[in-house]
Amino acid sequence: MNKIILFTITLLLQGGLCFGQKPVSVSSKAAGEKFEHFWSKSVGAGRANEGLRAGWLEQLEKVQQNCGFEYVRFHGIFHDDMFPIFEKDGKYTYNWQYIDDLFDRMLDLNVRPFVELAFFPTPLAAENSKTQFWWKANITPDESKYDEWYNLVQAFTQHCVDRYGIDEVLTWYFEVWNEPNLYYGFFDGTKSQYFELYKQSVLAVRSVDERLKVGGPSSSNFVADGRYDGEVESRDGDLITFTADNINDLEWKGSWIVDFLEYCEKEELPVDFISTHPYPTDYPFNPNTGKGKDFSRYVNSTKDDMEWLNEVIKNSAYPTAEIHLTEWNTSPNSRDAMHDFLPPAAYIAKVNLDCIGLANSLAFWTFTDIFEEKGGGESIFHGGFGMINYQGLVKPSYHAYRMLHQLGDEKIYHNDYLFVSRKSGDGKIVALAYNYPEDHYNAVPSSIKKIDQHKNGKSRSLDFNLSDLKSGTMFKIEVLDWESGNIYDYWEQMGKPEPPTREQIKVMKNYAENLDTDLVSADENGEVSFQRTLAPWSLVLIEQVN
């Protein structure tokens, strides 16, 4: 049966898509189920050198304070612009000044590095290495220099322990490379060469302390065909997906995950965590014509991918390995206009709440538009990944993470549009309502379709009653919708100033950060009702304040 139809029937049976929903009644004293805020464990950024900029650090401080992110992951810790290694007369010396500067500043902001061991510094790359991005990340391995790679990773790890202490570094994660399955993207080598690189890396890190956490393979999006089954990516394998009548009918699998686990078992190598990037998209090529297609999968695809991954790990030699999904967004395109709009906020809320318990982290890619894989943005809103733009204007995606962070740590109710939680420390209730319209379930929002199409969608009625409160208990209600917190439309109404003046930036920041709010209180019976229409893609945070 078509997954969309099956998914829709299930929700209809649960009452989840009945847009004249029955009232929901929840007792504030109801038994709660503990859960982890896996959405705030880690967040992504572009490359290490960008983290030395004042604006990047200011924005990191903001998302740490308001969204609770504990780790940040980025590319290029060993890239030439961090100057980690010098070669003279055939001898290597190491230089950690730039990395120290970055890590020191991050730790001062209470954010730890989720260390991605990449890319090759020029002295350790293959001669005439292929490069990625305008900043020329070296991606071609030279196996004759793997011993020197081992030495670099070992020296780097030892330096981190010496500088920050073993107790601190034991909390870090060391991930080997980024998306090595993308032969045309990030690793100009074979699957076997990556596996050997992982071996050298994990042995180097563990030589410093066997308790340090190392993982991989940091592979790209899930696929429904065999393009990554061989030693290098084969575009002949895309045809199944390219010609599918409905991509959501296909069976999707993680890239290189099974082979990686089998290799590590055979070589008796540690695997402390599995990492991969479950973007809900695919870009298959027709091998006969060379033409590509842009696909967005259905809304529940990320959950499907996580469930597949949990099953594979459970049946592997590493059943206790953590799961860190080190990149995720509505798409992996840093010029996808949808990233600046409202719909991703509802998607972020829905997916994270639906996937509680399925991963240790789901890292949004990225927290900032200070991000230069395709160079600087040509406009202040250019479809960048970031939840904050270059000028420091927060987007709806930022508010989604801020609202998720406000939730408690005990779940007391959850359906397809409402999550009610309690804070175990003080017993306060925090609820999040959201409307991901059912008429958009078949594809995650992206600019593959016109943006205007996503302004349409079914509204939803919220009729929610809380009981067993003290009389007078106050709740603050915050609304994120097309009229409140939707900074792109506000900028458009201002005439799209490019670049905006300093005064215009202040005005836009005030609008973007201050959502429409209201206050309600429990009656003399200790009850309070929340009744409103949820516009398509909107979020409503209901937070007890006393």
Please report, for each region that a protein language model flagged, where it lies by residue.
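Sec-dependent N-terminal signal peptides
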Residues: I4-Q14
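Boundary at the C-terminal end of the N-terminal hydrophobic targeting segment
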Residues: C18-G20
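N-terminal substrate-binding region of glycoside hydrolase catalytic domains
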Residues: K22-Q158, G165-T171, E175-V176, N181, ...
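Loop/turn elements at helix/coil->beta-strand transitions in domains of secreted/extracellular proteins
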Residues: H37-S40, C67-V72, D108-F114, V169-Y173, ...
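Conserved, mostly hydrophobic/aromatic
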Residues: S42, M106, F156, F174, ...
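Noncatalytic carbohydrate-binding groove/subsite architecture in carbohydrate-active enzymes
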Residues: K191-D354, L358, I380
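Aromatic/acidic polysaccharide-binding cleft in carbohydrate-active enzymes
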Residues: H324-K450
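C-terminal beta-sandwich/jelly-roll accessory domains of carbohydrate-active enzymes
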Residues: Y434-N546
